[in-house]
Amino acid sequence: MGTASIKLNKKTALFLATALMGLLSCAKNEAGENDFEPPKLTVLSPQEGQVFANGDTIHIVAEATDNAALHEYAWGIYDTAGVIVPSQFGLVHDEKRYTIRGSHVVGGIATTTLWTVWVHSDDERDNYDDYEINIIVSP
């Protein structure tokens, strides 16, 4: 059984991801009612410009911290055409610190190309932080 991919440009993909997170946020509690400080993301892996080949695993590791309470996170990998290679969303409630983890095995790459890893975290008041890392994938 094969996998399907959806071709979206990056702005459309980010809009859809944000809309999904907005829908998920309907169940938020009132924690952090006066919180105007966004979470802080520290991406530990991958590194900017890191090179991956077919068969390699891209490990996404990021630390999200917030002064009040984290709410959710997302990560995705986009190719140069804006196609989402993989992505993941998750809910994190009432935590001030959370380690975001994900992975993707590179496969089917015929020519060297640039991919973008996107990591996102928001808190209970919809304050957010986004981070992008460019990586190189090759056959």
Over which residues does each language-model region extend?
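C-terminal motif of bacterial Sec signal peptides marking the signal peptidase cleavage site
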Residues: 22-25
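Proline/serine/threonine-rich low-complexity linkers at boundaries of modular beta-sandwich domains
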Residues: 30-41
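Solvent-exposed loop/turn segments flanking beta-strands in beta-repeat/beta-sandwich domains
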Residues: 67-79
